[in-house]
Amino acid sequence: MKYNQYAYVETSPEKATEELLAINFLPENYSSLSFSELLAVLTGNVLAEATTRQAKDAKLAEFAVDDQTDLAAFLLDTPTAITASQFANVALQLLGYHPNYDYSLTDPLTCGEKHALPAFKDLTSKEELIFAFYRLLNTRSKNGQILLDVMAGKGYFTQFWGEGKFMLFNGKSLPVFDTSQVIREVVYVQSDLDTDGDGKGDLLPVTVFRPVESQDQLKVPALYTASPYFGGIIDNVKTNHNVDENLTDATTWTNPKYVAKPLVKSPAPSGQDVPATELATGQSSYGLNEYLLARGFASVFSGAIGNRHGDGIRITGSPEETISQKEVIEWLTGDRVAYTDRTRRFETKAGWCSGNVGMTGRSYLGTLQIAIATTGVKGLKTVVSEAAISSWYDYYREHGLVIAPSECQGEDMDKLAEVCQSNLWDGGNFTAKKAYEAEQAELLAAQDRATGQYSDFWESRNYRHHADGIKCSWISVHGLNDWNVKPKNVYKIWQKVKQLPVESHLFLHQGPHYNMNNLVSIDFTDLMNLWFVHELLEVENGAYEQWPKVMIQDNLEADKWHAESDWANDLGQASLYSPTADGYLSTVENGTGQLTFTDLGGTEFKKAGISETDWEYQFISGEKKWAKASLRFESEEFLHPTTLVGRPKVQVRVAANKTVGQLSVALVDLGTRQRLTATPKIFARGNQPFGYRFEADSLQEFVPDKATKAKLITKAHMNLQNYQDMKQPSKLEAGQFVDLEFELQPTYYTLPAGAKLCLIIYSTDQGMTKRPLETEDYTVDLAGTALLLYRK
């Protein structure tokens, strides 16, 4: 598998020598050493676990330069050069590869090529040797980290602990901060919001992890993770809403309104600054933050309103949620008051903070980055938003229907608010409990599970409509197989952000609702190190030009990444497909006639007792038990690999035999073959240290799985009563043909030669839609039905 490396910054030999001297890797007297002496010293310096020169020299005999000679013996002959093969053998062993198991000592260069390592060359001078080691320290090891990070995990940089300054190497920050003495504290930011109605501004607990060096003169930037889950998660999955019910006439919709909560203006910060008096007991919940904490970036967490030990109530996706999370940044930049404890007597300041703030986090934590960024708050320099919701309607609804996130049937805004209302665990907080119960009733009514229609309630939770307020640089990360936060969330915010005068990048991986910072195929953590050094330390290191604007992981070969200028329909050419009465999906023949299927609702699914995931696979694979409740149209086999890009669109002329109806459409890759695993395989658990005796991550990657018959590419759903307007329902008569036109979730998917594309038209999606208790007939007029794709 290829260890692709995008974060290495091209560096001159002169600059490389300067950086090696600065970290005490290259000895000051290097010019007086012979080639062989220098080779021994530099190799030994990689072995950070050996703390004396004698111990380092003793270990040289453990390394082979070829299949006959160890490094110590090789050095006895005082060589003045080393061949590419010999150096590759030493380098591969330093990188963690095992000779005779991972590669052959007689052919190490093939191993380097296999893993996409930098090319090894004959080294005939000390200058070449020095630069070769510089490049080696910046090369990804078998554990996925660059060799310098492996050395850090063994204690190499403890020699710099206590110096109280950032050190950079190849444009990235080094772990020179004492992780054994991290300051862990809690403060209480006062909000302008009074969401619990007690007449006082809500107090928001904020947990800070920062380098001990920031106690003195050093000011450090902050990585802020807005996490509603930080105070704890209330498990309420057993009380999720019932989805086994018939559809409701959507014309009963009343357009529920958003109603703002009262404000209580917080006092301006005074000159008082008392050190924090509460120790943090919560743990960091995001690996990238821990990695960068060892490199000098403070890590800040807050769940804001409704979180454990704080005030207020959770109001999922609301402007109040955005305001409360933004207020934490205002404290970090000196513009908002915070207290040492809940008595509100003593103010405490973030004097340790440089005023530069970046944001990190996935899912809800990524969502709040989008929300806060739209406010344009001072001090927020960049966001790295992973698997984020950009409109809450697109999370819990779609085209006039109640639609669940994957594996979350019955969840909704009110249930998620309860999950995150961790101050309910503070038994004495009766104020919050009473306000929470009232808010739950309001959320239940306003979210309108009866009709699923767009409303003012949902409009207030659409961050994309405020995208023009974004002033910070932007990185979005999303899984192309994420059916929790569906891909159109990132696609639609990307269409906005890419037009703004801010630097922006997009990463799309093959995962579901997942992180990508520890994949084999990309050095994402190193890229983020480079990025945050540029954005928060304000060091010009070429980060903006270092990698392509859009990077997309291939669905056939996990270690292949596509560089694109954008992610949009116009990456491809439009192709129109028509379904025909004999079950073909054709580019040359128009469909005629009508076909009918009978939807069984959730009755058969409930009887089967299988999971929603198992149902979906059996359904898309064409198992008769489930396929009979659908219409399936298959293309001819593709002669050449074909990549689908952007958002497919369908037009379906359909009639139902009832006055309500829901239509689902799926695109499926057919053909029995190996496909990538749904989630990455862990190669080694806990093998990526963030620093010395600190936290760690696990190397992982998608790998070929056992053969399957089919794979879902994309899908979408629509309420038949929205045939005239996506934002307003219309009356539907039984037997009335209506023309539905809607887009599917966006994709970037390569169909290999020999694959078939299958269009499935159905109604009940057991994992996402409501599951009616009665059957319903749907008749599709093929003359008014078509599929528009964009193909590369």
Swiss-Prot record:
Q: Which organism is it from?
A: Lactobacillus delbrueckii subsp. bulgaricus (strain ATCC 11842 / DSM 20081 / BCRC 10696 / JCM 1002 / NBRC 13953 / NCIMB 11778 / NCTC 12712 / WDCM 00102 / Lb 14)
- Taking the record's annotation, the residue ranges forming a coiled coil are none
What is this protein identified as?
Xaa-Pro dipeptidyl-peptidase
Which gene does this sequence derive from?
A: pepX
What keywords would UniProt list here? Aminopeptidase, Cytoplasm, Hydrolase, Protease, Serine protease
> Subcellular location, in the record's words?
Cytoplasm
Q: Does the keyword tRNA processing apply?
A: no
| Example GO BP | proteolysis
Domain of life assignment: Bacteria
InterPro entries from the xrefs? Answer: AB_hydrolase_fold, Galactose-bd-like_sf, Pept_S15_Xpro, PepX_N_dom, PepX_N_dom_sf, Xaa-Pro-like_dom, Xaa-Pro_dipept_C
EC code: 3.4.14.11
Q: Tell me, what is one Gene Ontology molecular-function annotation carried by this entry?
A: dipeptidyl-peptidase activity
| A GO cellular component entry from the record | cytoplasm
Q: What does this protein do, in the record's words?
A: Removes N-terminal dipeptides sequentially from polypeptides having unsubstituted N-termini provided that the penultimate residue is proline.
- Presence of the UniProt keyword Transport in the record: no
What family does this belong to?
A: Belongs to the peptidase S15 family.
Q: How does it assemble?
A: Homodimer.
Signal peptide start-end: none
The entry's active site is 363 (charge relay system), 482 (charge relay system), 513 (charge relay system)
- What Pfam families does the record point to? Peptidase_S15, PepX_C, PepX_N
The record's catalysed reaction(s) read: Hydrolyzes Xaa-Pro-|- bonds to release unblocked, N-terminal dipeptides from substrates including Ala-Pro-|-p-nitroanilide and (sequentially) Tyr-Pro-|-Phe-Pro-|-Gly-Pro-|-Ile
The principal localisation class reads: cytoplasm
